[in-house]
Amino acid sequence: MKKTFIFLTMLLIWIETSFAQTNPAITAWIQNHDGTTGRHYVANNPTPIDDGILANVQSVDYSDNWVYVSATGIPSYITGPFLDNNPSLATDQQAIYKISLNPTQNTGTATNTTGGNIGVFVNGVSLFDYRDGVRWDNNYNRLCGGPGNPSCSGGPQANRDWNRDAIPAEMGGFDCNKAHPAMGNYHHHQNPSAFDLDLLVVSDVCDTYPADGLYVIDVNEHSPLIGFTYDGFPIYGAYAYKNTDGTGGITRMKSSYSLRNITTRVNGPYVGQVFTIQNGPNAGNQQVMDLGYFREDYEYIDNSEPDYLDEHNGRFAVTPDYPEGVYAYYATVDENHNSAYPYVVGPTFYGNVTGADVNTINENTTNYNSNLSVNEHPENILDLKIYPNPNQDFVAIQSNLLDKKLQLQLVNELGQVVLESEILSGSTLNILETHTLYNGIYFLKVSYEKQQKSYKIIINK
């Protein structure tokens, strides 16, 4: 009897552990086990400043129905500066994200996305939808809401026909990671990869203030799982299997939204109208309200091709993390890898919205420690992009999204270690300064847990 009891107890523990290790909503989070802290730039100073705040996710706890993700909202990649006179910095949100482990499709009227948090990325950074809170007030023929604009007539909750899209309107205020803070809440509206990695670079902020974003687009690999929304469904990066059954090779996931063919907007400004900001730090600046300036400039066009997404910006398909298939959203980009509306989720959710940022955990939970997990890492974890090579003054080392640190050693031909560094968990980039080294052949030794790999690097000044 005693042996039977012990066996049953061990079986229950094994079942519980197996559940945690096979549910990506529990295992996908980038936990901070090494004390990594956030860093930020300020304008006119390209040297990062340490925040002194723990980065990434601090704790993951789960029950039968929920996972609770405790995070500061601070990434390990360098944030800032925000060059549109945004006075805010990324600050500790002390957040606890409650996400369903059993998400369900909403079979009734779809729920609109809202301003503020609608999900969370795997590093604990908030996800916002397209909007920035600025709208067109047709009663006064002006923009309303947001910094520097008058309040909207009827109050902040009044519906408006034309709601501004943050991506074109606030381009100058995004940092290299394509993100910015709202009253300290650092967040992404769009695909969270760095501007300078796009095929057509639309912002030069990375030239002075380099950072790496959450992940690197690889056109030959299925993009990683990068977050979860408040309806409990996962978010992937920009590329996936073409066909929903996992066949057809890798391709870019495409938005089914297109700009409408209009020159006027009913109860709104005409296309191309110029608006001058009247108040605030950007007073006197002008913005051209071209097509795409407002969310309502887009229309949904149904497409039966498997690599085109539905009206929520998702589809049901096989993914590396869900071999039986799952409904998932995708961070959509165009052919130049520039962000494409509706960016991640929206304008409505696919599922029933049950998630939230809560104050406390009010049920019994089990803690998940990724340091103790036995998850297998992808074989390409040490496949790096190294450029320029040959180099003169620096070499950039780009990795895929990491859940643990990547150790770097630069070794000369005598076997001497001349430089040591690392790529932090939740980060993808390291820049080694080589201007003090002699010309010659060097070897970059890369270590990830027990895996190792070497690359030849040439310095030629």
Predicted regions: what they are:
Residues 1-22, 374:
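Bacterial Sec-dependent N-terminal signal peptides
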Residues 21-175:
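Solvent-exposed N-terminal domain segments of exported/luminal and surface proteins
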Residues 69-115, 119-122, 192-244, 342-348, ...:
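A short, polar beta-strand/turn micro-motif
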Residues 122-125, 182-195, 322-338:
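Extracellular/lumenal glycan-associated surfaces
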